[in-house]
From Swiss-Prot:
InterPro entries: Atg22, Atg22-like, ATG22/LtaA_families, MFS_trans_sf. Keywords: Amino-acid transport, Autophagy, Glycoprotein, Membrane, Transmembrane, Transmembrane helix, Transport, Vacuole. Glycans are attached at N303, N662. The keyword Transmembrane helix applies. This is Autophagy-related protein 22-2. The keyword Nuclease does not apply. The lineage of its organism: Eukaryota, Fungi, Dikarya, Ascomycota, Pezizomycotina. The gene is ATG22-2. Vacuolar effluxer which mediate the efflux of amino acids resulting from autophagic degradation. The release of autophagic amino acids allows the maintenance of protein synthesis and viability during nitrogen starvation. GO terms for biological process: amino acid transmembrane export from vacuole; autophagy.
Length: 680
């Protein structure tokens, strides 16, 4: 069990070896209180007894009214993990499995065959719940060819298979616009926690409302899918912006000498709105140093917390750290992100298994699919409640608005600020070389992740003739592998002494094996074998395991690495850019695969495109330098804070609008000049 700091007076601290010239009761013996630094590449120390010591230098002092500088607690981390447990089931089970099938089936029951445009595609059948052997046999048999079906929406003929694709395209577009409209405002005021929770509850309710949707109102199902997918994306983007805050105020970052990567905040302090007192900080520092004399680091990568203080070393001796080791913040961020992804995958696995049982019980009926979506929405709703209770708001600095501003004008001000902030964020990202490189690689990588997944499912269904139960089993295997990957990649990278960038490169290399394996089917020797190169159904299962294992590593490492590169205080804006890059890229890959399929009449030629798409991010990631990116991000944050302060002071003193415009022009010019060296 991970030790926690006892109450003040409950333990006898380790008494350090006396230094030369000191006596046992010397008042000048020093107690180490590690300071919080930007990079934590060295553990600077300061004496409590030193006259220059200031409590505010040891604990982050509030930079604005309402800032929450309390240490990250176990309860707060649990709230962050809990939302992954709640919402990951929607994207894995809903978006990845049941919503596309449900939308297609709802449209099919209203469509006609493309061949004659008069014969109904499918007549409704009664619901007969059963667990008979024939039910399982029907699910495992390849589905017979039903023919292409079309429906008419607003006088336009649309293929039922394309109905779900168009629905998600619309939802992605709305999602991007919504994220832009409120992302900048999420960094200001007390809305950083409230907005994502509102989106979470609305999205979960929209998912549950699939239950009463019958084929006659299939367009309502499309509307619900758009609402739920839009709300999911918006809520996840905003909650991702909590990750740098949780890391920044984590005790192992504030007190790097500690050997236990857990919160030292007692249950009473978790509910206290005040920052820790000087007495508490001194007490926690003694406990941290006391632990460092007794035991090794708990559950930390070996190259991050190696060389803790020896048992008889003075407490003022700095901890030696290899120059090649990643920072404490990045190691912790990767660990939290990995745990969050893995916890979400475990929940998705449970709900996916539950959904398969429900579908089998109702013999793949329309009602069974809608019931599964109701369960997914209910799961999302219920487990979002602990997140709302445990995750602290940690509000950002408020916007400078007049005290009597109406709610409408306040909302309009936040809306306009968000769009302006995105434009500034894009400009800032252009000035940050490593952020720009990472986003370019992530654009291609995210597109390849979405395209490979959709292409594989379509290939398995149409070319290999796999049934819905077989496809669901592939999803289960991929989810299990994702859980394993999320927990394993951090330990593999530590064991092999890999940097985060090198770990991502390893994931990309393994990912490239999937399309290359599909291209083996073109070799005549492999064709004569009759297997390998995706010629048999069973070959999809190991590829699904590779896909999930790789995705578990990419999901956690990419998110945490990006959090290290962005400026502090602008997390929501930069994570909005991250999400827009993610969502926007997913439009191109599937469209190109569809065009290739239409041109050659089969999907296998699309593997050539996938091999190129997956491989392109590899050389780009080679140029990403985390240390350089962290330094440039910190420098940009300081410059932006300085310019913001100067501008606010000048705006107050300005007498007319023209002076303000001139000032804005000067501020932009100063920003460009300050970072001109980055473009040389």
């Amino acid at each position: 069990m991970v030790p926690r700091a006892p109450r003040i007076g409950d333990f006898e601290p380790y008494r350090p070896q006396l230094l030369r010239g000191q006596t046992d009761d010397s008042d000048t013996s020093k107690l180490s209180v590690p300071l919080s630094s930007q990079s934590n590449e060295a553990d600077d120390e300061q004496s409590l007894s030193d006259p220059s010591y200031d409590m505010e230098s040891s604990a982050d002092s509030p930079q604005y009214e309402g800032e929450d500088t309390r240490l990250t607690s176990n309860k707060e981390l649990s709230g962050f993990y809990m939302y992954g447990w709640a919402a990951e089931v929607f994207v894995v089970c809903g978006i990845g499995s049941f919503i596309p099938v449900t939308l297609e089936q709802l449209a099919r029951e209203n469509g006609v065959l493309l061949s004659d445009r008069t014969t109904p595609c499918k007549a409704p059948r009664p619901i007969t719940p059963s667990f008979s052997a024939s039910s399982f046999e029907a699910l495992l048999r390849p589905n017979p060819e039903k023919g292409q079906c079309v429906v008419h929406i607003l006088g336009i003929e649309i293929n039922t298979a394309s109905f779900a694709m168009y629905t998600f395209s619309i939802s992605v577009l709305i999602q991007a616009l919504l994220i832009i409209s409120m992302s900048g405002a999420a960094d200001h005021g007390e809305i950083q926690e409230n907005i994502p929770l509102v989106f979470a509850f609305v999205g979960s309710i929209a998912t549950m409302l699939f239950l009463p949707v019958v084929p006659k109102v299939y367009l309502l199902g499309a509307v619900l899918a758009i609402i739920s997918n839009t709300c999911f994306g918006a809520s996840f983007v905003l909650l991702n912006s909590f990750l740098p805050l949780l890391v920044r105020f984590h005790p192992t970052v504030r007190y790097p000498e500690s050997s236990a990567d857990t919160s030292y905040v007692s249950d009473e302090e978790e509910d206290d709105s005040q920052t820790p007192t000087q007495e508490r900080i001194e007490h926690e520092a003694r406990w941290a140093n006391h632990l460092s004399q007794r035991e090794a680091a708990l559950d930390e990568p070996a190259n991050v917390t190696t060389a803790l203080l020896p048992s008889r070393a003075p407490l003022t001796s700095p901890r030696v750290k290899p120059s090649t080791a990643p920072s404490q913040e990045l190691a912790l961020s990767t660990k939290i992100s990995s745990y969050g992804i893995a916890i979400g995958y475990i929940a998705a696995l449970l709900v996916q298994t539950m959904g398969i049982i429900v579908v089998i019980f109702f013999q793949s009926s329309n009602f069974g699919l809608r019931l599964v979506l109701f369960i997914i929405g209910l799961w999302w709703f219920i487990f979002t409640i602990p997140t709302a209770r445990w995750l602290r708001p940690r509000p950002g600095p408020p916007l400078h608005l007049a005290p009597q501003t109406s709610n409408f004008r306040t909302g309009l001000a936040y809306f306009s600020y968000s769009w302006k902030a995105l434009a500034r964020t894009a400009t800032h990202a252009r000035l940050l070389k490593d952020v720009l490189l990472f986003l370019t690689a992530w654009f291609l990588l995210s597109d390849s992740i979405a395209t490979v997944s959709g292409t594989a499912v379509l290939f398995a269904k149409t070319t290999l003739g796999m049934s819905y139960a077989m496809l669901a089993l592939i999803n289960v295997i991929a989810t299990l592998s994702g859980v394993l990957g999320a927990f394993t990649w951090s330990r593999l990278s530590s064991f092999c002494a890999l940097s985060p960038v090198q770990t991502i490169l390893c994931c990309i290399f393994l990912f490239e094996l999937i399309p290359l394996y599909g291209l083996l089917g073109y070799l005549p020797a492999v064709q004569r074998l009759g297997y390998l190169g995706l010629q048999q159904q069973w070959e999809m299962y190991p590829l699904g395991a590779v896909y999930g294992f790789v995705l578990g590593g990419l999901s956690s490492y990419c998110r945490s690495l990006y959090g290290e590169l962005i400026p502090r205080g602008y997390e929501a804006q930069f994570y909005a850019l991250y999400a827009i890059t993610d969502k926007g890229s997913s439009v191109f890959g599937p469209a190109i695969v569809g065009a290739i399929t239409d041109r050659w009449g089969e999907i296998r030629p699309a593997f050539w495109f996938l091999a190129v798409l997956v491989g392109l991010p590899f050389p780009i990631m080679l140029f990403v330098n985390v240390e350089r990116g962290r330094e440039e991000g910190a420098a940009l944050a300081r410059k932006l804070e300085e310019l913001s302060r100067l501008r606010d002071e000048a705006v107050v003193a300005a007498e007319d609008e023209g002076e303000d415009e001139n000032l804005s022009r000067d501020v932009r010019q100063g920003l460009e000049e300050s970072f001109s060296y980055q473009r040389s």
